[in-house]
Amino acid sequence: MVGQGLHNTGFPTIRYGLALNLLSIGRLKFESYEVENIRPLVTASPLFSRLLTELGEQKLARVIGATEMITGSLIAARPFAPRASALGSLGAAGIFATTLSFLATTPEAWQEKRREPKLSLAGQFLVKDIVLLGASLLTAAESLQASRRTQSTTR
């Protein structure tokens, strides 16, 4: 019983916390200071540096922000659109896998002059996306299961 109660509380917390995270951070991409904050990450990334050249900093930040906000909205749509929520969760998994790749491409993610690699403040900021990636995969799985249940009851 306690386990089920924790599950019933924990899963919505994961889902809506994930959605809120994406909506909030996505909205910030429309602020000039956030454009400056993501500059070192996108400049060092092979994928994003190309997009940066084509779109410029402001447009790239807005595309990223809009993507994050749409993804967060889809995740939150789970009660009435579980398939859309699953799509949003899978999109979020892609977002967080991409940001985790910045650990490999951003020199500022690691402290220099150490015997073994140690995360810098930027690296610590990025490594939390492992948890968000896991949350995205869990919410995708649950939404897909809910979608199947919905389909089987409507047949």
Description of each model-found segment:
Residues 1-155:
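Membrane-interface extramembranous regions
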